[in-house]
A protein has these predicted regions:
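NAD(P)+-binding Rossmann beta1-loop-alpha1 motif at the extreme N-terminus of oxidoreductases
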Residues: 1-52, 56
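Rossmann-like NAD(P)(H) cofactor-binding subdomain of soluble oxidoreductases
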Residues: 74-126
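Interdomain hinge/lid region at the active-site interface
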Residues: 201-271
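Short beta->alpha hinge that forms the Motif I/post-I loop of the SAM-binding pocket
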Residues: 31, 66, 91
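Internal alpha-helical scaffold of NAD(P)-dependent oxidoreductase catalytic cores
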Residues: 130-215
Length: 281
């Protein structure tokens, strides 16, 4: 299969590296010529250019690894060059704000979005080889127009990339769940780090708990600002629910309520253990 990857950042670079090693013919485009040159020099891609039109007519699949707001702009500019049965997909972390419009803009090509649940704190193609997909989730978000054949092609893409669990779900359920499992987690990490009044002194006392909780606080501010705003209704609901649970813990502390604290801790332990069982299976 011939693929064009639009955007050679961390994820785009990781896709290029893995797919080329799986026998795909991989082309890439990026506004940064240095990223293209790096990918060519390290055999991540067969060829690359700063102009998507150099490859777009000749590939079977176009993978958009660009910011949410840039996706529709790209489609408006290049969809007239798409061909029938060509698959257009994206790796974006939110879906419902643009996928339906993207589906219409992409015709006569076939648009089907997906979301690789993986990444690193660092950004850029230079770090993409370190991006691990093994054991991670790969979410496909078909619409009513998406055929079974298209979903299966994306399933194979996820398998070839090395993902462990591949799930199909609608765009609205995706955004609801991602608002909790990904965006709320990032919001908590950011808030925890920013609540520190004396960060220079804190480093003397950091252990595994703080490191584990705050790893994702090193965040791409431009990308994540877009992701949060595109999914703000879901995220605000999750933040409110989290605050309610944190308040319950706070009030138990204020009232010396050991019984409630123990109940909260037991509940979280049981839920987390059940999650681990499902992950192992």
């Amino acid at each position: 299969m011939k693929v064009l990857i639009v955007g050679l950042g961390l994820i785009g670079g990781a896709y290029a590296y893995r797919l080329k090693n799986k026998g795909y013919k991989v082309y890439a485009t990026d506004i940064n010529l240095e990223s293209i040159q790096f990918a060519k020099e390290h055999s991540y891609i067969d060829d690359g250019s700063c102009e998507a039109l150099d490859f777009i007519r000749d590939v079977d699949m176009v993978i958009l690894s660009i910011y949410p707001q840039a996706i529709l702009e790209f489609l408006k500019k290049y969809s007239k060059y798409f061909k029938e049965n060509q698959i257009i997909t994206d790796v974006c972390g939110v879906k419902s704000s643009f996928v339906l419009e993207a589906t219409e803009l992409s015709k006569p090509a076939i648009y089907c979005s997906h979301h690789p649940m993986a990444g690193r704190e660092k950004s850029g193609v230079k770090y993409s080889k370190e991006c691990k997909f093994e054991g991670a989730n790969f979410l496909i978000t078909p619409t009513r127009e998406t055929s079974y054949k298209t979903v299966e092609i994306l399933r194979k893409l996820g398998t070839d990339l090395g993902f462990k669990r591949i799930t199909a779900m609608d765009i609205y359920e995706h955004d609801k769940m991602i608002g909790f499992t990904s965006q709320l987690a990032h919001a908590i990490a950011v808030s925890l780090v920013n609540s520190d009044n004396n960060p220079n002194n804190t480093k003397k006392y950091i252990g595994d708990s703080y490191r584990d909780l705050t790893r994702i606080a090193m965040i791409n501010d431009t990308l994540w600002s877009e992701l949060f705003l595109e999914n703000k209704e879901n995220l605000v609901k999750h933040i409110n629910c989290f605050q309610k649970n944190l308040d319950e813990l706070k009030y138990a502390l204020m009232n010396d309520d050991k019984e409630t604290l123990e109940s909260l801790f037991k509940s979280s332990t049981i839920i987390r253990k059940e999650m681990e069982k499902k992950w192992r299976n």
